[in-house]
């Protein structure tokens, strides 16, 4: 369900317009705690995101030594009308979090060997771009297979219920 201009998809209920969803992260990692972070963007990046483009595949967040959280390898395509004022498509972008949240992320990454993974990027009601990030632990191959089996069973169960009822 997207707008007529082919822009970001609107999710029913909470008023968020989802730009990008990192479905691969939920398969490859078991997600623990999640955080909502603002993101520092250039004007051409925001306009490009308004068209509903952008990808979080292979993106990750890292805590720098200066205590900042950076979103690395997220893809935001160039905005054609920006001409010479365009941006780099995969540049590191600063995530905006409270100091306590940054300290919690840094501690989990250092002590427990967890990874900070972006889960989705969306527009709020006020038009701000937010990124939902999660503390993640990598899954083993057996866990991934188990996830596939569960999804398959849920699909089969739904199919049987549709046919029967």
From Swiss-Prot:
InterPro entries: SmpB, SsrA-bd_prot, SsrA-bd_prot_CS. One of its GO terms (molecular function) is RNA binding. GO terms for biological process: trans-translation. It comes from the Bacteria. The keyword GTP-binding does not apply. SUPFAM superfamilies: Small protein B (SmpB). The keyword Methyltransferase does not apply. Keywords: Cytoplasm, RNA-binding. It is found in: Cytoplasm. One of its GO terms (cellular component) is cytosol. PANTHER family: SSRA-BINDING PROTEIN, TMRNA-BINDING COMPONENT OF TRANS-TRANSLATION TAGGING COMPLEX. Required for rescue of stalled ribosomes mediated by trans-translation. Binds to transfer-messenger RNA (tmRNA), required for stable association of tmRNA with ribosomes. tmRNA and SmpB together mimic tRNA shape, replacing the anticodon stem-loop with SmpB. tmRNA is encoded by the ssrA gene; the 2 termini fold to resemble tRNA(Ala) and it encodes a 'tag peptide', a short internal open reading frame. During trans-translation Ala-aminoacylated tmRNA acts like a tRNA, entering the A-site of stalled ribosomes, displacing the stalled mRNA. NCBIfam families: PRK05422.1, smpB. Belongs to the SmpB family. This is SsrA-binding protein.
